[in-house]
Amino acid sequence: MNLKQALIDNDSIRLGLEANNWKEAVKVAVDPLIESGAILPEYYDAIIESTEEYGPYYILMPGMAMPHARPEAGVQSDAFSLITLQNLVVFSDGKEVSVLLALAATSSKIHTSVAIPQIIALFELEDSIARLQACQTKEDVLAMIEESKDSPYLEGLDLES
């Protein structure tokens, strides 16, 4: 699963969206994947239920969340969406987020061995959250992903398959 290609294939980069709370933020993050057929609507419900039970375990760094649920919760194909919000939303643990990268993985192996390294590579770029917030076009986001491809986290990964 290639982050850049998955975002292109699913037309799932959305910038400057509005959300009044964390549930709306998760909804606008997964909507592009529902629209593309990568996930079923119940995937959203599974994320909400899991968040309410375990807290927002998918906030990976200040300002950024990677909402996801288990593969059997409605994943049809491997996919990502990346959205930015106009305003910060506060999650149940008090953490604020303005960038969400939703992940749909058909297996836990893809999640840990392929998806996570690409996400780390992107978000380890200097000022990644501010830079993503400043992106005006999908092409701006894709250029940042391209910039991240030299990350040591991606060494040895076959991102073309």
Predicted features along the sequence, with ranges:
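Cytosolic covalent-transfer regions centered on His/Cys nucleophiles
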Residues: M1-S161
